[in-house]
Regions:
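Terminal amphipathic alpha-helical/low-complexity segments used for targeting or macromolecular assembly
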Residues: 1-51, 57, 75, 87, ...
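Compositionally biased, low-structure terminal segments
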Residues: 6-8, 15, 181, 188, ...
Length: 241
């Protein structure tokens, strides 16, 4: 594709680097951009490829690449060696940084951050003050919201909700239609699949495995080498190991 933008001549310093305001040279119908529209800020022409666009006061800088029909808007920042592709939207005050890769139809919004070497693909929504970082992989129809944290080497696939102050970290593997609510914590090498629900101050950790429709709530703990499956409710101060 021929070059689809130019520098307007406006520039400013952003976090120690000079960034340039851009202007569209061609229509980008899928993004509702027409030739002549003024966009956001980039450090170099290499920051935008294909028909990707940056608008408002958003910034794409350093070695970051925004590709395909992805859009960066609002006051969002894409930096480092991050790659944003597909039909991804990064907006509001969100940040995608370091070596993170966001693809598919993901939306990163609010004050959320995707950092480290995190890989995000599919219909993923990361919003509010959520953080996704380190070597995490998210793939599927996943929502990470409010103050939730997904970090470490966690692998999360399927139709998963991580919200409130929930944390999913370390080497855990999550799949299916799992929900993490409240102050729930899942860490260690835990494995959870099916339609499980972890909520309140519950914890699942070490090598515990949950399958089926297990619900862990209140201050219950499931850990050690425990394997729980079927339609089970673990509550109160229960300690299963």
């Amino acid at each position: 594709m021929a070059k689809h933008f130019e520098f307007t001549g406006d520039e400013r310093v952003f976090e120690g680097v000079t960034v340039h305001r851009i202007r569209a040279l061609v229509d980008l119908p899928e993004l509702n951009v027409v030739a002549g529209d003024v966009g956001g800020w980039v450090e170099s022409e290499d920051n935008l490829a294909e028909s990707a666009w940056v608008m408002d006061e958003a910034v794409v800088c350093q070695d970051a690449r925004v590709m395909d029909s992805a859009v960066v808007s609002g006051n969002a920042v894409v930096s480092g060696q991050a790659k944003v592709s597909g039909s991804v939207v990064v907006t509001d005050n969100a940040q995608v940084a370091d070596g993170a890769k966001v693809s598919g139809s993901a939306v990163v919004s609010g004050q959320s951050q995707v950092r480290g070497k995190a890989k995000v693909n599919g219909s993923v929504t990361i919003m509010d003050n959520a953080q996704v970082c380190d070597d995490v992989e998210l793939a599927g129809v996943i929502t990470v919201s409010v103050n939730a944290l997904v970090c470490g080497n966690a692998l999360v696939t399927g139709e998963v909700l991580v919200t409130d102050n929930a944390q999913v970290r370390d080497d855990v593997e999550i799949s299916g239609k799992v929900k993490f609510l409240g102050n729930a914590q899942v860490f260690g090498s835990a494995l959870i699949s099916g339609s499980c629900r972890i909520e309140d101050d519950a914890q699942v950790f070490e090598h515990a495995e949950l399958y089926g429709r297990v619900r862990v709530k209140d201050r219950a703990q499931v850990h050690g080498s425990a394997v729980v499956y079927g339609k089970v409710k673990i509550k109160g101060k229960s300690n299963v190991h």
